[in-house]
């Protein structure tokens, strides 16, 4: 990684800087990127990810992907047992099958992890209500200023608020 301070035309090659992607290329970029980050998703979840495409545009993108074989339909089970249709990249299907036997080690997730970014989706899938409370007045916070969710295997099981003690470099 390198920071450069100069005029754009002196840093970015002209053929890259002047490229104007078509709407279809932009749509494909947004939908592909969203699905890559989410792993599996509905059209609405794809459209909500960047808030760049509409749900109907995402549905059309999904339909094209299903016809071409690039995407595959799957059913996911929500925390309440309800099934929902979602799509996954066909090439990712074998990897998903491999990773279903998830490690039970604990992971502390960032509040901005793609799995948590859409709070309603995370609550549906994991049955775990999570809200970041940095902008909530202290008296109204339920869990703390900057709380991290803890994942064990494929389940969100707890929250932790980590505070740094600057003088001793300890985490509390």
What are these regions (language model features)?
Residues 1-107, 112-116, 121, 128-132, ...:
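Long, low-complexity intrinsically disordered regions
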